[in-house]
Amino acid sequence: MANLSTLITIALLLCATMLTCSARPEPAYFASFTTSPADTLSLEMIESKLHEVAGESCDKEDDEDCLVRRTLTAHLDYIYTHKNNHH
């Protein structure tokens, strides 16, 4: 009887393990950490857009879109310059 309960316990643990493994499939696409020419081009386009937006001034106090763009520009500029300084 003890062998039967041990066998059932092991079978239940095995089934539970199989269910958790199948519940979280691996993603089909793994992002590469290498920089491809397309990524470099994309970064250059983003950087040129950042410089374009950075030169813009928010004249109106209620121009929320302008403030959002400038904040985003500042954050992205910090991220890219921080990344470039720590290679």
Swiss-Prot record:
One of its GO terms (cellular component) is extracellular matrix. The modification Sulfotyrosine is found at residues 78, 80. Its main location: secreted. Residues 24-77, 83-87 form a propeptide. Pfam families: PSK. InterPro entries: Phytosulfokine. GO terms for molecular function: growth factor activity. Residues 1-23 form the signal peptide. It is found in: Secreted. The keyword Lipid biosynthesis does not apply. Sulfation is important for activity and for the binding to a putative membrane receptor. GO terms for biological process: cell differentiation; cell population proliferation. Keywords: Developmental protein, Differentiation, Growth factor, Secreted, Signal, Sulfation. Promotes plant cell differentiation, organogenesis and somatic embryogenesis as well as cell proliferation. Belongs to the phytosulfokine family. This is Putative phytosulfokines 4. It comes from Arabidopsis thaliana.
